[in-house]
């Protein structure tokens, strides 16, 4: 519990340091079932009820109909229910043959991201919270330097004018090792994923 409070303080610091959340925000979380998104639901779900700024959180789980694995949707819903958060399931798919220049992992990620924007708009959200942590941000920086020769990574806050939406990363100051320990403490149930495309990913 002390560790959870420590992580909450890091999330609080990120919220105020980067202006991630303000009063009246309605925020969508995409819950994949991994430890990072489960922790994000716990952190923002709790914070939305007892701390300022006051904001609303809704949770969605995106099912890719052409990927042969399924998460335990009842379990994911129970994690949202614990904080009194609305939970929605959205099903979509992608066709890997439409653009052979792009990897299936890219197309899947892009399709999920587009679905998040559509769901956020449908439910009146003005922000989408992603579960990237400090290690993800540093890894992206290194990958961009190695593969593209450019210095750049995922910002804590990104305004998407095209979609009239903001992407926020409230766990940008949180180390992955702390999230791993929280997952054990909270007893997060590991979701089994066997993606046929995962061996081709560079991450």
Give a label for each model feature:
Residues 153-154, 159-191, 196:
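Metal-dependent de-N-acetylase/amidase catalytic core
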Residues 198-203:
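RNase H-like two-metal-ion nuclease catalytic core shared by retroviral integrases
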């Amino acid at each position: 519990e002390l560790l959870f409070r420590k992580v909450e303080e890091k999330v609080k610091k990120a919220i105020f340091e980067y202006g991630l959340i303000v009063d009246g925000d309605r925020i969508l979380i995409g819950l994949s079932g991994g430890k990072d998104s489960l922790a994000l639901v716990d952190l923002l779900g709790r914070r939305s009820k007892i701390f300022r700024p006051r904001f609303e959180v809704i949770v969605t789980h995106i099912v890719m109909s052409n990927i042969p694995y399924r998460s335990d949707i009842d379990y994911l819903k129970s994690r949202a229910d614990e904080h009194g958060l609305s939970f929605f399931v959205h099903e979509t798919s992608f066709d890997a043959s439409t653009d052979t220049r792009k990897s299936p992992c890219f197309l899947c990620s892009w399709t999920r991201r587009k679905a998040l924007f559509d769901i956020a708009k449908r439910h009146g959200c003005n922000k989408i919270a992603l579960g990237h942590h400090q290690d993800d941000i540093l890894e992206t920086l290194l990958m961009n330097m190695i593969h593209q020769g450019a210095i750049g990574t995922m910002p804590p806050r990104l305004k998407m004018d095209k979609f009239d939406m903001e992407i926020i990363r409230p766990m940008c100051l949180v180390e992955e090792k702390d999230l791993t320990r929280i997952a054990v403490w909270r007893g997060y149930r590991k979701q089994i994923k066997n993606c046929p495309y995962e061996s081709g990913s560079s991450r």
